Amino acid sequence: MFEDTNMKAVSAEVMGTFFLVFIGLTAFSTLGGGFGGAFAFGATLMVLMHVMGPISGCHLNPAVSIGNFMSNKMSQDDTIAYVLGQVAGAFIAFAAMAGTFS
């Protein structure tokens, strides 16, 4: 299992999801839920799309990866690896944020 999975792409998904969740939650925690938080979240997503897009497609969301699998654009192994990477990135971001603001 996972012999053909592109680990560079999975690593990009882990890092991309980490940055999206960490910066997004930090922005909303410090700037509030108004324009500043939304702008920081959107700007982070835009930068990640340009940086991670060529490497992994910049899914950053298990629903996107599962949708690509359902439309036969990804293999089952790649989908599982992407989803696990995205979940890991989100948990690492939460732990980093909890450590930062505790």
Feature annotation, model-predicted:
Residues 1-102:
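Membrane-interface helix-loop junctions and terminal tails of multi-pass membrane proteins
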